[in-house]
Amino acid sequence: MSGSSLRRVAVFGATGSIGASALDVIARHPERLRASVLSAGSKVDALLALCVLHRPAHAVIADAALYPALRDGLRAAGLTTQAHAGDQALDALAASDACDTVVAAIVGAAGLSSTLAAAAAGKRLLLANKESLVLAGELLTRTAAAAGAEIIPIDSEHSAIFQCLRSCDASRGVRRVILTASGGPFRGRQRAQLAEVTPAQAVAHPKWSMGPKISVDSATLMNKGLEVIEAHHLFGLPGEQIDVLVHPQSLVHSLVEFVDGSTLAQLGLPDMRTTLAVGLAWPERVESGVGGLDLLQQGRLDFEAPDTEAFPCLRLAWDALRAGGTAPAILNAANEVAVSAFLQGKVGFLAIPALVEHTLTTLQRQNADTLNALLFADAEARRTTERALAHHSLHA
């Protein structure tokens, strides 16, 4: 990107933590970045406040019932921002000339349609929505390749691998990639100690500032399992070439080991603004607001193997990747339902992997060659998991 060209950025999921980080970086570079489209699910007041601050051309509220509040709020603020509502508006704006870059930060399967629309339109796609790759990885990467869209991952682990691989023309010389995991707030606990974990404890992540769903996924290690599946799609690697190490300091974000014996790692403070700055300016580097890494002050870097007995979600994700087809979509949908039930206090922490495993073993995998097949598998997995919630034997 030349210094004179203005990159118009759509931030989908603008009111979430990733959206806030993206807008922070964008605001630091008004000469080269502009937030042209902002979207939110139902937080209309927060979206209006962001519109006043960033003055986008378009604002979208996913909940159509809130459209009048958005429209009237924009008018009352004296803004020329055009109001839209619903998923179809998101898809249309993702594909339109209102933006050339899309930050896909809508949590869950709800973000899939607009992500695919951006890919099909050949946009630069800053992908923070894990579920798009887990649910429809083959479809998304195929769509992006056909349209010439550029997918730049935003989560720290895949951004690290992206940066290591792009630093040299050596993608075919990769022996393995190693994703690092903080281990979450319950690292070191035995399985029996996890039964009494509360939602408040699970969302208190030791290193990263994240939303509640992804915080729980980090606590169960499902987050890392989803990232294994993501890495498979993003970098074309089989599961056997993707490893996971627990690294509690969260300073080494991932490593790439090459066939010549060398290993490249990307290090930095745990702050999403770094990876967003990489995606927004690549191949250039711009200031993100994040300080440098002081290794003397940090002191030490520790690594250990993940405990898949206490945290079986990581193993379940590898199982789903090996099974292929709709299995990852089933895994993801079951997990979304289970985590939601846990956050509402309906089930215990250990019910999350139990429910996911139940659904994964109950439903047969199918081919995943169309979006309809994937959405059907997603819906079927949600129904199966909801039914299983009634059985208290799974809730232990």
UniProtKB/Swiss-Prot annotation:
Mn(2+) binds at residues 155, 157, 227. GO terms for molecular function: 1-deoxy-D-xylulose-5-phosphate reductoisomerase activity; manganese ion binding; NADPH binding. It catalyses: 2-C-methyl-D-erythritol 4-phosphate + NADP(+) = 1-deoxy-D-xylulose 5-phosphate + NADPH + H(+). Pathway: Isoprenoid biosynthesis; isopentenyl diphosphate biosynthesis via DXP pathway; isopentenyl diphosphate from 1-deoxy-D-xylulose 5-phosphate: step 1/6. It is an enzyme of class 1 (oxidoreductase). Keywords: Isoprene biosynthesis, Manganese, Metal-binding, NADP, Oxidoreductase. Its EC number is 1.1.1.267. NADPH binds at residues 15-18, 41, 129, 131, 211. Catalyzes the NADPH-dependent rearrangement and reduction of 1-deoxy-D-xylulose-5-phosphate (DXP) to 2-C-methyl-D-erythritol 4-phosphate (MEP). HAMAP family: DXP_reductoisom (MF_00183). PANTHER family: 1-DEOXY-D-XYLULOSE 5-PHOSPHATE REDUCTOISOMERASE (PTHR30525), 1-DEOXY-D-XYLULOSE 5-PHOSPHATE REDUCTOISOMERASE, CHLOROPLASTIC (PTHR30525:SF0). This is 1-deoxy-D-xylulose 5-phosphate reductoisomerase.
